[in-house]
Amino acid sequence: MKIYLVGGAVRDALLGLPVKDRDWVVVGSTPQEMLDAGYQQVGRDFPVFLHPQTHEEYALARTERKSGSGYTGFTCYAAPDVTLEDDLKRRDLTINALAQDDNGEIIDPYNGLGDLQNRLLRHVSPAFGEDPLRVLRVARFAARYAHLGFRIADETLTLMREMTHEGELEHLTPERVWKETESALTTRNPQVFFQVLRDCGALRVLFPEIDALFGVPAPARWHPEIDTGIHTLMTLSMAAMLSPQVDVRFATLCHDLGKGLTPPELWPRHHGHGPAGVKLVEQLCQRLRVPNEIRDLARLVAEFHDLIHTFPMLNPKTIVKLFDSIDAWRKPQRVEQLALTSEADVRGRTGFESADYPQGRWLREAWEVAQSVPTKAVVEAGFKGVEIREELTRRRIAAVASWKEQRCPKPD
């Protein structure tokens, strides 16, 4: 029996990145031998065991053979005669097909070290094409390591295009697509994930609402980048700089979906695109089974982001009604989320990357003023039932009006 550290732990250590999870491969052993040594078996489809002390995963070396469609259609073979090289060959990318023995020596049968040095994401073997999930995984790795200068090897991108063209992605479940997307949204450069999907044709299959934005023009006066798809990825990039939250980043990604519905004869204007985009947000989220909280914020951002841009023009009643509409009294975090997504929208434009966004500050200030109006005083004044809410709203509007007169510049 020989034990090797494999995969991501080896890769990230060589890149000088923090190692989170460690996975091990056991060569020359059997399930019974592992159980006798005190390991606990957890894998049902193939033999994976938990170490009795560290609880890290130890898998018997195995090979995989395609036996059906999609990413689950594989038959595994695990036996003492399966070599380390056999096991590493089934992995997706060469930089993930690295192993380290107990002396610290790196075993690299597929030139993963060379690709690591050259910052290349390259598939190990043609078997890559048998698993459609790998298209999403490579896009996610491209996003995760973009800041280190990694790019996808030409032959790997070509294979990803072929897989997409042959309909392999249609076998992916919504849950797996969302899981990979959610993970990509946590990276430093989530926009790279969607750009890679577009480069291989997968965006059209998995995110048609986003793909439809490319080639749709916006007024050059407001959008020097012109193309709404490019603007969408620029805003996502900006959102990633402004917030680590997945819901903020996803909402930013979806903020302009309504522009894809504008008839070409009305281009480059997109009047009413915000509310129009709400149904597309709902459609996308229902298809991918996006969690409700994330979906709800995306709907609100699509509907109201343009309203925030015009904040100095809003009357106090409209501002308080906005807080009602986003349910800010129960979910106050939405004010900050809406401020961040709206700022990302403005700064996600060519030449505006460092622009100030005072509307975000005014929104936050108005919220502090509105929420500081005490409910207790209204009750103590003798108001009852529905009158309490009406009087509370009236006082909030008055407070915001007073603040706006002093702090918010009047529109020209």
UniProtKB/Swiss-Prot annotation:
<keyword id="KW-0533">Nickel</keyword>
<keyword id="KW-0548">Nucleotidyltransferase</keyword>
<dbReference type="InterPro" id="IPR050124">
    <property type="entry name" value="tRNA_CCA-adding_enzyme"/>
</dbReference>
<keyword id="KW-0067">ATP-binding</keyword>
<feature type="binding site">
    <location>
        <position position="91"/>
    </location>
    <ligand>
        <name>CTP</name>
    </ligand>
</feature>
<dbReference type="InterPro" id="IPR003607">
    <property type="entry name" value="HD/PDEase_dom"/>
</dbReference>
<dbReference type="InterPro" id="IPR006674">
    <property type="entry name" value="HD_domain"/>
</dbReference>
<dbReference type="InterPro" id="IPR032828">
    <property type="entry name" value="PolyA_RNA-bd"/>
</dbReference>
<feature type="binding site">
    <location>
        <position position="11"/>
    </location>
    <ligand>
        <name>ATP</name>
    </ligand>
</feature>
<protein>
    <recommendedName>
        <fullName>Multifunctional CCA protein</fullName>
        <ecNumber>2.7.7.72</ecNumber>
        <ecNumber>3.1.3.-</ecNumber>
        <ecNumber>3.1.4.-</ecNumber>
    </recommendedName>
</protein>
<dbReference type="Pfam" id="PF01966">
    <property type="entry name" value="HD"/>
</dbReference>
<dbReference type="Pfam" id="PF12627">
    <property type="entry name" value="PolyA_pol_RNAbd"/>
</dbReference>
<feature type="binding site">
    <location>
        <position position="8"/>
    </location>
    <ligand>
        <name>ATP</name>
    </ligand>
</feature>
<feature type="binding site">
    <location>
        <position position="140"/>
    </location>
    <ligand>
        <name>ATP</name>
    </ligand>
</feature>
<feature type="binding site">
    <location>
        <position position="11"/>
    </location>
    <ligand>
        <name>CTP</name>
    </ligand>
</feature>
<feature type="binding site">
    <location>
        <position position="140"/>
    </location>
    <ligand>
        <name>CTP</name>
    </ligand>
</feature>
<dbReference type="GO" id="GO:0016791">
    <property type="term" value="F:phosphatase activity"/>
</dbReference>
<dbReference type="InterPro" id="IPR012006">
    <property type="entry name" value="CCA_bact"/>
</dbReference>
<dbReference type="GO" id="GO:0000287">
    <property type="term" value="F:magnesium ion binding"/>
</dbReference>
<keyword id="KW-0511">Multifunctional enzyme</keyword>
<dbReference type="GO" id="GO:0042245">
    <property type="term" value="P:RNA repair"/>
</dbReference>
<feature type="binding site">
    <location>
        <position position="21"/>
    </location>
    <ligand>
        <name>Mg(2+)</name>
    </ligand>
</feature>
<feature type="domain" description="HD">
    <location>
        <begin position="228"/>
        <end position="329"/>
    </location>
</feature>
<dbReference type="Pfam" id="PF01743">
    <property type="entry name" value="PolyA_pol"/>
</dbReference>
<dbReference type="GO" id="GO:0004810">
    <property type="term" value="F:CCA tRNA nucleotidyltransferase activity"/>
</dbReference>
<comment type="subunit">
    <text>Monomer. Can also form homodimers and oligomers.</text>
</comment>
<comment type="function">
    <text>Catalyzes the addition and repair of the essential 3'-terminal CCA sequence in tRNAs without using a nucleic acid template. Adds these three nucleotides in the order of C, C, and A to the tRNA nucleotide-73, using CTP and ATP as substrates and producing inorganic pyrophosphate. tRNA 3'-terminal CCA addition is required both for tRNA processing and repair. Also involved in tRNA surveillance by mediating tandem CCA addition to generate a CCACCA at the 3' terminus of unstable tRNAs. While stable tRNAs receive only 3'-terminal CCA, unstable tRNAs are marked with CCACCA and rapidly degraded.</text>
</comment>
<keyword id="KW-0547">Nucleotide-binding</keyword>
<keyword id="KW-0808">Transferase</keyword>
<feature type="binding site">
    <location>
        <position position="91"/>
    </location>
    <ligand>
        <name>ATP</name>
    </ligand>
</feature>
<keyword id="KW-0692">RNA repair</keyword>
<keyword id="KW-0378">Hydrolase</keyword>
<dbReference type="GO" id="GO:0005524">
    <property type="term" value="F:ATP binding"/>
</dbReference>
<dbReference type="GO" id="GO:0001680">
    <property type="term" value="P:tRNA 3'-terminal CCA addition"/>
</dbReference>
<feature type="binding site">
    <location>
        <position position="23"/>
    </location>
    <ligand>
        <name>Mg(2+)</name>
    </ligand>
</feature>
<keyword id="KW-0479">Metal-binding</keyword>
<dbReference type="GO" id="GO:0000049">
    <property type="term" value="F:tRNA binding"/>
</dbReference>
<feature type="binding site">
    <location>
        <position position="8"/>
    </location>
    <ligand>
        <name>CTP</name>
    </ligand>
</feature>
<feature type="binding site">
    <location>
        <position position="137"/>
    </location>
    <ligand>
        <name>CTP</name>
    </ligand>
</feature>
<dbReference type="InterPro" id="IPR002646">
    <property type="entry name" value="PolA_pol_head_dom"/>
</dbReference>
<feature type="binding site">
    <location>
        <position position="137"/>
    </location>
    <ligand>
        <name>ATP</name>
    </ligand>
</feature>
<dbReference type="InterPro" id="IPR043519">
    <property type="entry name" value="NT_sf"/>
</dbReference>
